[in-house]
């Protein structure tokens, strides 16, 4: 069941389900609990899962100011949510934006993190590349000015994206279904704001992470394999797996859940 909590200037939608060790699942940019339902339900077979819609995503109320989308803000939201539900310590797992948010909390409050799983990182702690920042900004502006159809049209103008969608047309349908779960102005602001924010900022030190870390790299334009490899090198003792990209969603989810379960069992 969805609950809502006001944390300063934003309100988050969240839920807790399943049974077993406590695990926090953090979705990626442009996703939400509904979009990650298969992952959340799979994890809930082995863990007590706290999942939430990040600020401005999904059922969380809109946040339309792009300046309010930073990793410092996302981390503050997550720490506030954990305080509210009374979780002092848990396994942290997340994809892309969610993985970077979880890693930031692991640097800010290391005692809170029992184990850390970073899936499909987009960078090794830096903001996105200038090209990706531009592409995300143009995508956000397309949503603002022309809605979802304009956004799809812009995506298809990017050669790498057009090739990927041509090889798997179902991905385009899934993306459209994902986007319509959000307030358009809110997700446009998120697409512009987050890529320009760096998870690893001055004052933070990856060496402060005390939890065991597993890195699951991606293998696409936004989440290049090299980024995952760089993250694994950056964090002392981190374990690196092979990417799951290129397989059907059902198989990808099954592999992700099994990999997380096995890693947590080991630590």
Where are these regions (language model features)?
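Catalytic active-site module of serine/aspartate enzymes centered on a nucleophile-bearing elbow/loop
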Residues: 237-267
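Active-site loop/oxyanion-hole signature of alpha/beta-hydrolase fold enzymes
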Residues: 41, 50-93
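Conserved HGGG/HGGXW glycine-rich cap/lid loop of the alpha/beta-hydrolase fold
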Residues: 7-62
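Conserved alpha/beta-hydrolase catalytic His-Asp/Glu region
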Residues: 127-129, 145-196
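Gly/Ala-rich beta-loop-alpha elbow adjacent to hydrolase catalytic centers
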Residues: 94-98, 102
């Amino acid at each position: 069941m969805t609950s809502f909590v006001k944390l300063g200037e934003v309100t988050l939608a969240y839920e807790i389900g399943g049974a077993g060790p406590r695990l926090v699942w953090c979705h990626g940019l442009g996703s939400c609990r509904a979009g990650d339902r298969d992952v959340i339900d799979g994890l809930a077979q082995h863990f007590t899962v706290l999942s939430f819609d990040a600020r401005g995503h999904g059922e969380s109320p809109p946040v339309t100011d792009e300046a309010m989308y930073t990793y410092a803000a996302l981390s503050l939201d997550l720490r506030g949510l954990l305080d509210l539900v009374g979780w002092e310590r848990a396994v942290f797992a997340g994809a892309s934006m969610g993985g970077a948010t979880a890693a930031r909390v692991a640097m800010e409050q290391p005692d809170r993190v029992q184990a850390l799983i970073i899936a499909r990182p987009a960078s090794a702690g830096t903001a996105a590349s200038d090209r990706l920042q531009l592409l995300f900004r143009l995508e956000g502006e397309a949503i603002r000015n022309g809605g979802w159809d304009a956004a799809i049209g812009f995506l298809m103008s990017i050669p790498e994206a057009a090739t990927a969608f041509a090889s798997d047309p179902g991905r385009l349908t899934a993306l459209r279904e994902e986007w319509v779960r959000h307030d358009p102005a809110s997700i446009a602001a998120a697409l512009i704001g987050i890529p320009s924010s760096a998870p690893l900022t001055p004052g933070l030190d990856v060496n402060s992470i005390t939890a065991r870390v597993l890195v699951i790299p991606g293998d696409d334009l936004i989440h290049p394999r090299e980024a995952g490899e760089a993250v694994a090198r950056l964090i002392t003792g981190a374990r690196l797996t092979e990417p799951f990209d290129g397989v059907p969603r059902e198989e990808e989810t099954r592999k992700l859940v099994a990999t997380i379960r096995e890693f947590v069992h080991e630590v």
